[in-house]
Structure formats: structure tokens, C-alpha cells
């Protein structure tokens, strides 16, 4: 045994000796039955077979251990203890002094006994007992002399019995089985859901692919249809150029101007008019000659001696021939019929001329549209914002173009208004324009009313252009309709005004209220293109928000004086003073009165044939203290009274939008009752007058 100890590495031997010497000396030589548990604890040595100090003889030690502070206590004689002394235990004479455990020995037995016959406390699961068993097992696996090794056990009392432990184990196992079953179910459900997700994902990808194909095909068909419509419009325009006329470039000095030349349809009408005028002149000349040949009446019968002279005058010439009374009346009746026929023909020519003028206006408008479309950078059907496919140009303004487009996402037609800034503008001016457009967008975006055009979207194209997407209406605006038809019936005009007032009422009921300020026929869209359908209000570029910060009792300040359309603005907008004028929703009331007047009479009540500059210079609106009504066409007194209430000069005396909405003329049942009351009162008055006259008789 000592030979085996001698074969240890010197460094390991020294460490072992220092370890055991320190433990043993601390307790003295009498307590050297220290346990091996510190030596055989888990992880303290390598996996090689343990070499005990007994395997090495004492005389083979060639170097001394380092001094230890406990050596003075451990030296009882002339030499130190052997390593084998630390593996010997005094049978029951003392207590164990293992520094690693610090547990007093309770029972001593051989390793075979401790492993094969564990105490009851160990079987019941005592933690200290299990620790002792593990320690003993570790020691027996590393020691070659099991007879010299003793294991210590400590018995502890536990409340668990084998039945309870078995019950706990069975409950735990059942719970574990349930959990495992639940886990299996959840895993199956998870797998099913994942499979469904994969299927739905594949279906979604398939649907997206189909949708992209449908959108692509829709774009292709829409572009093809738009191209065909463009070709048809240009062909029709070329045909109408010969029939209705065209623009020609004429040179005046160093400049060139465009001059309109009428087509053959107008030339034919002019020739017909000239022919009718010539025939009328000839008939008038013959009527004058007929008057000279008029025979004398019966009271002026010529004497008999004048009969030969009469025959003589007949022989001199037919122009001096005297007609009988019957011949004279017959010839006069023929001339009257011819004049009546020429008058009827002239009226037909005038009607045809007016019709051709309306068609010519459409033709001129189409020529300008085609010219602007050909010069536009968006003529080749681009898709803006990956959503809006431009089809054809609807119109062009000062800084904007309006295109009919198709919304590929919502699958609907829309009107795309492209705002293009002048590249030569200063950055400050561009910023102000963009700020103004953003303000219009914010105002218009929140509005939701059937009589107001909806604003769908707003986006930028580049630094100098941006777009607004509006609701598309098929028809034209009221201004174009009035240019075509001059005027309309009172019922049609009243229907339009009712819808406009309904929209204004909505604008003044929301918070904060809004003044449109630019209400005119050009901003009233006819949905069906006729005066007997629905209308929608658009263009909120000059609108005013009546918030609490800007609006007071007497109105809000007009910061944009000079803007707007002067024919439809009230006098307070033209007042010039130290402070800007105050306005309210009564501005829109004045505009309603002007529009209603124009619809009924075919002209504006103030400044009809004047330009905006002339109106401003001559103070036309400031002088419009009273409205005058022409005798024709005939208009009801209620309509005239309604117009007078709208066109009151002083804004303090003018009704507001809420009073306008409740006006009797715009409420059918009230208007009928008022009319019936008026008729009954007139009937009563006439009855009383007749009774009074009969009584006086």
C-alpha cells in the first residue's frame, strides 16, 4: 500500500497531506477518525483510481511538508502521523469530525451493510440520509479496502408514509399524463392551425395573384377604351372643324393671334338670312307700289269721263295700271302671307343659329381640351401613387389640370386635380401656395354631405406638384349650362337653390362653421348635366373657417380681400378702410341671390357686361343698393321677394344662412299655404268689394 502511495505525483501527494494534516490536527490526535467523505466527495478527485496514503512507505518521503499552524498540536511524539491514521476510526469511542459535513455520527456500519440494508429513514426519503448514501456510494467506488471504511447515517422523522408517497406519485403521474395528453391535443390543434394558415396563405397569395391579373387587365382595357375615345373625339373634332369652324393663326405686324373662322353651317345660315332679308325688302317694295295702285273707295268714285283716260293709262304701262278693289285686296293678302312666311322662316333660322352656337361652344371647348391634353405631360395614361390611372383631361385652369381617372383600389371613377407650381416662383410663393392647398384639403376632407363633392385623397408628386382626388360627376357645371341655355324655368332654378341652401346649412351646423366665399355657377356641378337633377358644391379654395379665435359677434376679418369672383360677392367685401372688413355667412346668402337671379333672367343683376377690373374700378357692387327686375321672362312675386331678401345692401339687415334655410319660398308646404292664404284673402276682398258695390247700387 505504501508503494502505491509512493507512486503518486509529488505535488498531489503534498496537497493530500496538507489537506488531511490540516483537518486532523485541528481536532487533535484523539479525534482522528475523520471521515473520508471530504476526500471522496463528488468532483474532488479525477476519475483515476484513488491511491491512499497507506500505499506509500514513510521512509520514501524525500521532502518535508510546509509548516502548518496546526502542526504544533498534531505532534504527539518524535514523528508525525501517518496518512493511514486518518482512515481509521475509533469504534464508537468518539464523534466524527468531518469538516465538510459537520454531522455527528449516529450509526456505523460497513459499506455493504449501508448499501444493502438502508435505515427506515433513508427509505422514507430523508434528505440527510440520501446524502449519506450518495457519499458512501462514492467512497465504495473509489476505495480498494471497504473493510476500513465506515459510513455515517442520521435518522430523521418524516410525516410521509409509503401509502402517501405512492398516492402522491400516482397523482403526479396522472397529472403528468393529463398534461401530456393536453400537450398532445394542443400540438395537434397547433399543427391543424398551422396547416390551415399555410392553406390560407397559399389561397391569399393565389387571390393576390388573381387580383393583380384582374387589375392589370382592367388597366389594359381602360387604356384601350380611353385611346379609342380619344381617336373618336379627334375625328369628330376634325369633322366639326369644317361644319362649325376652326381657329386660324393671323399675323398682325410682328405678332400672331388666333382668329375664329366659321364653318359651312354658319355660312349657309348667313346666306339663308340674306335671302330672307332680300325677299322681305322686295315684298316691302311691292307693297309700296300696291299702295299707289290702290283704287279709290266707293265714296270717291271717279266720274265717267275719266274712263277713257284710265284705258289710255293702261296702254302706257302696267306700273300705272289702276287695280280694282278686289284685285288690290287680293294682292295685299298675298304680300301679307309672304311676309308671315318669311318671318316664320327667319325665326327658324334664328333657332338653328342659336343651336349651332351652342354646338360651336362645345366644339371650341373640345378643341381647347384636345390642345391642352396633347401638350400635357400626363397624356400617356400614367398611374399616379400606384393607384390612380389617368384616362383623359377634363379641363385646365391657371395652375392645375383635372383628369378623369380610375381608382384601381376602390374600383371607381374619380377626378384627379393636379396642381403644378411655376418653377420660376420663389420658394416663399411655392410654400404659400402649398400651404393654401393643404388648408383646402383639411377643410374639404372633413366634409360629408350629399350636396358637397367628396375629397378622397391627397398626395405629392414632386417638389413642384401635388394632387387631390375628388368625387367624379358626369355632368357639367351650372355656368356651362347657362351659357348653353341662357336661362331656365323657375321650378328648375328653385330646385337648384334649395339644394345649395341645404349644403350651406350643413356648412354652418358643423363645428367650426365654414363660409364658402366663392359660391358661383362654376362651382355648382350638375350631376346629370341637366337642371332637373341633383347638384354638388365644389372648390373650397377660398373658404373661411369661423373658429373662436377669428370669429366675433360682428363677423371675422377678411384677410383675402380682392380674391373671389366679383359678380357674386356682397358690398361689404369691397369696403376699403384702415381695418379689413368683417364678413359672415351672409356672404354666401348674397351669392345665392345673384345665382338665382341669373338662372331666372339669364344675366347677372350687377355688372353683367363688365369685367372684374371694371367692376373694381367703377365700384359697381358698392353702388348696388337695389335690384331691378326686367319685365320678361315672367317670374312669380315670391321669387322676386326671395331675391330681394338675399340682396339686401346692408349686411346687418340681410338674413343669414339659418334664416335662409327656413325661408317660406324654399319650404313647399309653407309656400303653398301662404299662396293659398293670399288667394283666399284676394277672393274675400273681391267678394266684399262686389257686395259693397251692389249695396251702393
UniProtKB/Swiss-Prot annotation:
Keyword Transcription regulation included in the entry's annotation: no
Mark out the compositionally biased spans (Polar residues): 31-44, 109-145
Name the domain of life this protein comes from: Eukaryota
Q: Which residues does ATP bind?
A: 394-402, 417
**Domain annotation Protein kinase: ranges:** 388-666
Q: Name one GO biological process term.
A: chromosome segregation
Reaction(s) this enzyme catalyzes, per UniProt: L-seryl-[protein] + ATP = O-phospho-L-seryl-[protein] + ADP + H(+); L-threonyl-[protein] + ATP = O-phospho-L-threonyl-[protein] + ADP + H(+)
Q: How is it modified after translation?
A: Phosphorylated. Autophosphorylated; phosphorylation promotes the assembly of higher order oligomers and enzymatic activity.
**Predominant location:** nucleus
Please list the disulfide bridges.
Answer: none
**Which residues of this protein are catalytic?**
518
Which co-factor is required? Mg(2+)
Region of interest: Disordered: 25-159, 288-316
What keywords would UniProt list here?
ATP-binding, Coiled coil, Cytoplasm, Cytoskeleton, Kinase, Nucleotide-binding, Nucleus, Serine/threonine-protein kinase, Transferase
The compartments listed are:
Nucleus; Nucleus, Nucleoplasm; Cytoplasm, Perinuclear region; Cytoplasm, Cytoskeleton
What start-end ranges are recorded for coiled-coil regions in this protein?
A: 265-294, 336-373
EC number(s) stated in the UniProt entry for this protein: 2.7.11.1
Any one Gene Ontology molecular-function term assigned to this protein's record: ATP binding
Question: GO CC terms for this protein?
Answer: cytoskeleton; nucleoplasm; nucleus; perinuclear region of cytoplasm
Family membership noted in the UniProt record: Belongs to the protein kinase superfamily. Ser/Thr protein kinase family.
Q: How does it assemble?
A: Monomer. May form homodimers; homodimerization may enhance autophosphoylation and enzymatic activity. Heterodimer with TLK1.
> What name does this protein carry?
Serine/threonine-protein kinase tousled-like 2
User: What is the species listed in this Swiss-Prot or TrEMBL entry?
Assistant: Danio rerio
Amino acid at each position: 500500500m505504501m508503494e502505491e502511495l509512493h507512486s503518486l505525483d509529488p505535488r498531489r501527494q503534498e496537497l493530500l497531506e496538507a489537506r488531511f494534516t490540516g483537518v486532523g490536527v485541528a481536532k487533535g490526535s484523539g479525534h482522528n477518525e475523520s471521515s473520508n467523505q471530504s476526500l471522496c466527495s463528488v468532483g474532488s478527485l479525477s476519475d483515476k483510481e484513488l491511491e491512499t496514503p497507506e500505499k506509500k512507505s514513510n521512509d520514501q518521503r524525500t521532502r518535508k511538508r510546509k509548516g502548518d499552524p496546526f502542526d504544533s498540536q498534531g505532534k504527539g511524539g518524535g514523528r508525525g502521523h501517518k496518512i493511514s491514521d486518518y482512515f481509521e476510526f475509533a469504534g464508537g469511542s468518539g464523534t466524527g469530525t468531518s469538516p465538510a459535513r459537520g454531522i455527528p455520527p449516529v450509526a456505523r456500519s460497513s459499506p455493504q451493510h449501508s448499501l444493502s440494508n438502508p435505515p427506515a429513514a433513508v427509505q422514507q426519503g430523508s434528505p440527510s440520509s440520501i446524502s449519506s448514501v450518495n457519499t458512501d456510494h462514492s467512497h465504495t467506488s473509489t476505495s480498494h479496502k471497504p473493510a476500513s471504511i465506515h459510513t455515517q447515517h442520521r435518522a430523521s422523522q418524516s410525516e410521509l408514509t409509503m401509502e402517501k408517497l405512492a398516492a402522491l406519485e400516482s397523482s403526479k403521474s396522472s397529472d403528468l399524463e393529463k398534461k401530456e395528453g393536453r400537450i398532445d391535443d394542443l400540438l395537434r390543434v397547433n399543427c391543424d392551425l398551422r396547416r390551415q394558415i399555410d392553406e390560407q396563405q397559399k389561397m391569399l397569395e393565389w387571390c393576390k395573384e388573381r387580383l393583380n391579373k384582374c387589375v392589370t387587365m382592367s388597366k389594359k382595357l381602360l387604356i384601350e377604351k380611353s385611346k379609342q375615345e380619344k381617336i373618336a373625339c379627334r375625328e369628330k373634332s376634325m369633322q366639326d372643324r369644317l361644319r362649325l369652324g376652326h381657329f386660324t393663326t393671323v399675323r398682325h405686324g410682328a405678332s400672331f393671334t388666333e382668329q375664329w373662322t366659321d364653318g359651312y353651317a354658319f355660312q349657309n345660315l348667313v346666306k339663308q338670312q340674306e335671302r330672307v332679308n332680300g325677299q322681305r325688302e322686295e315684298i316691302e317694295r311691292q307693297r309700296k307700289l300696291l299702295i299707289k295702285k290702290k283704287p279709290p273707295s266707293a265714296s270717291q268714285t271717279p266720274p265717267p269721263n275719266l274712263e277713257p283716260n284710265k284705258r289710255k293709262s293702261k296702254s302706257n304701262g302696267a306700273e300705272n295700271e289702276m287695280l280694282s278693289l278686289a284685285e288690290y285686296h287680293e294682292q295685299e293678302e298675298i304680300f301679307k302671307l309672304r311676309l308671315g312666311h318669311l318671318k316664320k322662316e327667319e325665326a327658324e333660322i334664328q333657332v338653328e343659329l342659336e343651336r349651332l352656337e351652342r354646338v360651336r361652344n362645345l366644339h371650341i371647348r373640345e378643341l381647347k381640351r384636345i390642345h391642352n391634353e396633347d401638350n400635357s405631360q400626363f397624356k400617356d395614361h400614367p398611374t399616379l401613387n400606384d393607384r390612380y390611372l389617368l384616362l383623359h383631361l377634363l379641363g385646365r385652369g391657371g395652375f392645375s389640370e383635372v383628369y378623369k381617372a380610375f381608382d384601381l383600389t376602390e374600383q371607381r371613377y374619380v377626378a384627379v386635380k393636379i396642381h403644378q407650381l411655376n418653377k420660376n416662383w420663389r420658394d416663399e410663393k411655392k410654400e404659400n401656395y402649398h400651404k393654401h392647398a393643404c388648408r383646402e384639403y383639411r377643410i374639404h376632407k372633413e366634409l360629408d354631405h350629399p350636396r358637397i363633392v367628396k375629397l378622397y385623397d391627397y398626395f405629392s408628386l414632386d417638389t413642384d406638384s401635388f394632387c387631390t382626388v375628388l368625387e367624379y360627376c358626369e355632368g357639367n357645371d351650372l355656368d356651362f349650362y347657362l351659357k348653353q341655355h341662357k336661362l331656365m324655368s323657375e321650378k328648375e332654378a328653385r330646385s337648384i337653390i334649395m339644394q345649395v341652401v341645404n349644403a350651406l346649412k350643413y356648412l354652418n351646423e358643423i363645428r367650426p362653421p365654414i363660409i364658402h366665399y366663392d359660391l358661383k355657377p362654376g362651382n355648382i356641378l350638375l350631376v346629370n348635366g341637366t337642371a332637373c337633377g341633383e347638384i354638388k358644391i365644389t372648390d373650397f379654395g377660398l373658404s373661411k373657417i369661423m373658429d373662436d379665435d377669428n370669429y366675433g359677434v360682428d363677423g371675422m376679418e377678411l384677410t383675402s380681400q380682392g380674391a373671389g369672383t366679383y359678380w357674386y360677392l356682397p358690398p361689404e367685401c369691397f369696403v376699403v378702410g384702415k381695418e379689413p372688413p368683417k364678413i359672415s355667412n351672409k356672404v354666401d346668402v348674397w351669392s345665392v341671390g345673384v345665382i338665382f337671379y341669373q338662372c331666372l333672367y339669364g344675366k347677372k343683376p350687377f355688372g353683367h357686361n363688365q369685367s372684374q377690373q371694371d367692376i373694381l374700378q367703377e365700384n359697381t357692387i358698392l353702388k348696388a343698393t337695389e335690384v331691378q327686375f326686367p319685365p320678361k321672362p315672367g317670374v312669380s312675386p315670391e321669387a322676386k321677394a326671395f331675391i330681394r331678401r338675399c340682396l339686401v345692401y346692408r349686411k346687418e339687415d340681410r338674413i343669414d344662412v339659418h334664416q335662409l334655410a327656413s325661408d317660406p319660398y324654399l319650404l313647399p308646404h309653407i309656400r303653398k299655404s301662404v299662396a293659398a292664404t293670399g288667394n283666399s284673402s284676394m277672393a274675400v276682398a273681391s267678394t266684399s268689394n262686389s257686395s259693397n258695390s251692389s249695396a251702393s247700387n
